[in-house]
Every structure is written in C-alpha cells, then in structure tokens.
Amino acid sequence: MKTLIRPLVVLFVVLTAVTGLAYPAVMTVFGQAVFPSQANGSLIEQNGKVVGSALIGQSFDAPKYFWGRLSATAPMPYNAAGSGGSNLGPLNPSLADQVKARIAALRDAGTDLSKPVPVDLVTASASGLDPEITPAAAAYQVERVAKARNLTPDAVAQLVAANTAGRQFGVLGEPRVNVLKLNLALDAAQAAH
C-alpha cells in the first residue's frame, strides 16, 4: 500500500508545484515583459487616470457620444461579472420588442432613420460587453454626434476613420471601431476646437 501512495503523493506535489506555481509565475513574468498593456487589462488612461479598458464596453447615452453595442448583462449594463447574452432567439417576440424600442431610442435622439439601422446598434452581443462597433454603425451616428457637438460631419467622419482598426494581420476579423477610444478622441478634438 505504501508503495502505491508514495508515488501518488510525490506526483501530486510535483504537479501542484509545476501547474499551480511555476507555470503561472512564468506566464505572468512573460506577459509583463512582452505584453505589459494587455497583461494589465488594456487599460486606457487620460490625464493619468484610468477611464476604461479597450476590452470592455461602456455605456454612452448622451447624443454627443457614439453609442456602442447594447449590453444584456444583469443586473446593470456592462457588468463584467454578469457577462452573457440575452439568449433571446430570432423568433422570440421579446427580441423584436427590444429592437423596436432601441430603434425608437435612436429616433428620439435625433438619428435619421431613413437609412437602414446597422444591426449592432439594436442588438446585444453574445458577451454583452463588446467595446467595438462596425464602421457602418459609427457612420450611422456621425450626423447626430456632429450636430450635438457643433462640429462638421466631415470632421467627425475623419475621427471615425482615424479610429477604425482593420482586420488583424489583414485576414482575421472585421474592421471595427473602439467606442471608448473614439469618444475620447472626440472630446480631445472638441477641446482643441
């Protein structure tokens, strides 16, 4: 019996040390050395103060800001601890009601509804925390944001273009706009204006 237990205990201790201590320590040091921003949460600072993360969406509802994808997290929007989608199917009447309410909110904010509304402005993402929207969703909001900030639509469109990231490595994903970075660029441009 002793001959069976001893190797098991040794294996348990060795694997615990390797997988529970050594591997996490090596990965932490590697991450901090090679990818320090990402290892610390891709935090965005303004005037020495953390204002958000490039990886987690935030709620913007003032007309002078670009709005991101809607959050389905509970009990409050953009709650990272409650990440998850609404799980409403495409034929669920509740989803249709939510989309209609979101279109009405866009209309009430002064958005021109003569153009088709990009789907990412009226539906929540799978995680409920998406920090990015499509360039089409950003372009759809240019007129409203320009009017609210007393800027020309061309100036706002240039900021959208400057804050649009292409496909990763030229092939992965789709072009996207980080809403927090764009809104911070808008604030900076208006302060300089």
Curated annotation (Swiss-Prot):
The keyword Protein transport does not apply. Keywords: ATP-binding, Cell inner membrane, Cell membrane, Ion transport, Membrane, Nucleotide-binding, Potassium, Potassium transport, Transmembrane, Transmembrane helix, Transport. It is a single-pass membrane protein. GO terms for molecular function: ATP binding; P-type potassium transmembrane transporter activity. It is found in: Cell inner membrane. It holds the Pfam family KdpC. PANTHER family: POTASSIUM-TRANSPORTING ATPASE C CHAIN (PTHR30042), POTASSIUM-TRANSPORTING ATPASE KDPC SUBUNIT (PTHR30042:SF2). This is Potassium-transporting ATPase KdpC subunit. It comes from Burkholderia orbicola (strain MC0-3). The gene is kdpC.
